[in-house]
UniProtKB/Swiss-Prot annotation:
Record-listed E.C. numbers: 1.1.5.9
Named cofactor requirement(s): FAD
Compartments it resides in: Secreted
Organism: Drosophila pseudoobscura pseudoobscura (Fruit fly)
An annotated GO cellular component: extracellular region
Catalytic activity: a quinone + D-glucose = D-glucono-1,5-lactone + a quinol
Position of the signal peptide: 1-42
Record-given protein name: Glucose dehydrogenase [FAD, quinone]
A Pfam family this chain is assigned to: GMC_oxred_N
Primary enzyme class: oxidoreductase
Keyword Flavoprotein on entry: yes
Active site: 544
Similarity field: Belongs to the GMC oxidoreductase family.
Superkingdom, natural source: Eukaryota
Length: 625
């Protein structure tokens, strides 16, 4: 157990970002959360006033840099950190948001910051076939507007996807992206805290990103594993040899503390004089010479609306994620010519695939009740257990770190997982009463199982709303427009119900919530037709958006970048984030985003003559800058 230090070696600054109390809405629990935040800010390993990258924050950028990285999120933080390892390169990282709030370091509070000031709070355009019960039939897309991006507010689950995901990328004309090619870059970043348990063939120690299990899991977590075994599944590392089964996942955390990409990669680089960071600054466009199509710099707007141009010597890297990366390219005049002209953006380079191929995992929240009167409340006793020892309810995410992957009859290939189960409940957050998994009127508690489609067939796209860079883009998700996605979800729901009927979960009195979904009253409850209706009414988009700047060869009309992540037809411009995925990986996308950034930084170093890492036949990556 980790005991936090009692004093810091430097002054604690002003609070950054939304507070825990402000994220609790009108809850009567706000006073407790406000006091809790005071105690949290006195904990040096949580507040980390000495370790934050604030020494690199700049109010005024220099005139010119070797590299400019747009977006300090899950991938951009990694790219900037790795490029600044070369001391003769001057690197600028530009982030539209501010620094990460201290409350986000607490695992149990991970849902608090969705919808807060560090969230872009995107909504899709009205959906035809999904989110039908939502206001105006719009799906909500939380995306991090903060240093560290969505890794500051995600569930922290470290999932790499299937081996076949990457082999398929390579087979589509992207050499260097097979599973064997990318595994060293997963291992490069990884500091696995349980290496003896998972082995060295697929995992490594010594990287910047801590990966390990939370200190605490509710007893129900282990019952879920037993339930999976009763149904014939193994409990195993889904990032290893096999990707089918159940597990308590490893997380991007250490000692009960979240490690965002900013905390893991930028804070260790904070003393490098060649790394500068601009916060609260929006890139309005990448500056591209219309004749040569060479990138010359970027145009930015600070939080007060002041505009300036910053020049680049070598390359600009766009790492805004699957929503903002295509938006930045479009604002820069790179994209479908006809779409740009509609919003009065001057086309610089016609590239029809920008914003296309957008897709995301899609889920359905299946509600259950359990009988459990022994759960402890979130009170000062449990808070002190976390503050003093980084253990207990607040050191984890309840049962949300349990997951399972499996193949349905709709899978493209036998035994290739196309469905993932997530679980929700026992979350120590700001509930109405302060009780973890609050008691309902019948003395039961609610938990959720939500199956997610890992290989969605439905495709959407992103376009500009206007030429104003502060206008959110128009997002057409087109969820469930391919019937195969609906069929896979229904299979997942029926599996979740069967799981609830196993003996380990029957001991909890687990039972399906039979409240009829509004709009589905005409269907027999729990029939396939009923569930097909339900998933369209109460659609649950995951936060794993991908594909909108697709990687592919030049003969692919929808490809935006090549296998070296260079934007087709533009010199000095690359994209490095999940938007380059030809097809989204089968699982949470944070670990693949970090891998893409690691490989992208490697490609940049190699292209510009820096010493680079060598990959040997055993897939070991030797760390040489």
């Amino acid at each position: 157990m980790a005991t936090s230090p009692s004093s810091c070696d430097c002054l604690v600054g002003v609070p950054t970002g939304p507070t825990l109390a402000s994220t609790c809405g009108g809850s009567a629990f706000m006073l407790f959360m406000g006091l809790l935040e005071v105690f949290i800010r006195s904990q040096c390993d949580l507040e980390d006033p000495c370790g934050r990258a604030s020494t690199r924050f700049r109010s005024e950028p220099d005139y010119e840099y070797d590299f400019i990285v747009i977006g300090g999120g899950s991938a951009g933080s990694v790219v900037a950190s790795r490029l600044s390892e070369v001391p003769q390169w001057k690197v600028l990282l530009i982030e539209a948001g501010g620094d990460e709030p201290v409350g986000a370091q607490i695992p149990s509070m991970f849902l608090n910051f969705i919808g807060s000031d560090i969230d872009y709070r995107y909504n899709t355009e009205p959906e035809r076939m999904a989110c039908l019960s939502s206001m105006e039939q719009r799906c909500y897309w939380p995306r991090g507007k903060v240093l560290g991006g969505t890794s500051v507010m995600n569930g922290m689950m470290y999932i790499r996807g299937n081996r076949e995901d990457y082999d398929d990328w390579a087979a589509q004309g992207n050499p260097g992206w097979s599973y064997q090619d990318v595994l060293p870059f997963f291992k490069k970043s990884e500091d696995n805290l349980e290496l003896d348990a998972v082995g060295t063939e697929y995992h490594a120690k010594g990287g910047l990103l801590p990966v390990g299990k939370f200190p605490y899991n509710p007893p129900l977590s282990y019952a879920l594993l037993k339930a999976g075994e009763e149904m014939g599944f193994s409990v195993q590392d889904l990032n290893g040899q096999n990707s089918t089964g159940f597990m308590i996942a490893q997380m991007t955390a250490r000692n009960g503390i979240r490690y965002s990409s900013a905390r893991a990669f930028l804070r260790p680089a904070r003393m490098r004089n060649n790394l500068h960071i601009l916060l609260n600054t929006t890139v309005t466009k990448v500056l591209i010479h219309p004749g040569t199509k060479n990138v010359v710099g970027v145009e930015v707007s600070d939080q007060f609306g002041s505009m300036r141009k910053i020049l680049v010597k070598k390359e600009v890297i766009v790492s805004g994620g699957a929503v903002n990366s295509p938006q930045i390219l479009l604002l820069s005049g790179v994209g479908p010519k006809e779409d740009l002209q509609k919003v009065n953006v001057r086309p610089v380079h016609h590239l029809p695939g920008v914003g296309k191929n957008l897709h995301n995992h899609v889920a359905y929240f299946t509600n259950f009740f359990i009988d459990d009167a022994d759960t402890a409340p979130l009170n000062w006793a449990t808070a002190m257990e976390y503050l003093l020892f980084r253990d207990g309810l607040m050191s984890g995410t309840g049962i949300s770190d349990v997951t399972a992957k499996m193949a349905t009859r709709w899978a493209d290939r036998p035994n290739l997982p196309d469905l993932q189960l997530y679980f929700g409940g026992y979350l120590a957050s700001c509930a109405r009463t302060g009780q973890v998994g609050e008691l309902l009127s019948n003395n039961s508690r609610a938990i959720q199982i939500f199956p997610a489609v890992l290989n969605p067939k439905s495709r959407g796209y992103i376009t500009l709303r206007s030429a104003d860079p502060l206008d959110p883009p128009r997002i057409f998700a087109n969820y469930l427009t391919d019937e195969r996605d609906v069929k896979t979800l229904v299979e997942g729901i029926k599996f979740a119900i069967r799981l609830s009927q196993t003996s380990p979960l029957k001991q909890y009195g687990m039972r399906l919530d039979k409240t009829v979904v509004k709009g589905c009253e005409s269907h027999a409850f729990a029939s396939d037709a009923y569930w097909e209706c339900a998933v369209r009414q109460n659609t649950g988009p995951e936060n794993h958006q991908a594909g909108s700047c697709k990687m592919g060869p030049s003969h692919d009309p929808m490809a935006v970048v090549n296998h070296e992540l260079r934007v087709h037809g533009v010199r000095g411009l690359r994209v490095m984030d999940t938007s380059i995925m030809p097809k989204v990986t089968a699982g949470n996308t944070h670990a693949p985003a970090v891998m893409i950034a690691e490989k992208g930084a490697y490609l940049l170093k190699r292209a510009w003559g820096a010493k680079v890492u060598r990959v040997d036949a055993t897939w070991t990556l030797h760390r040489v800058i």
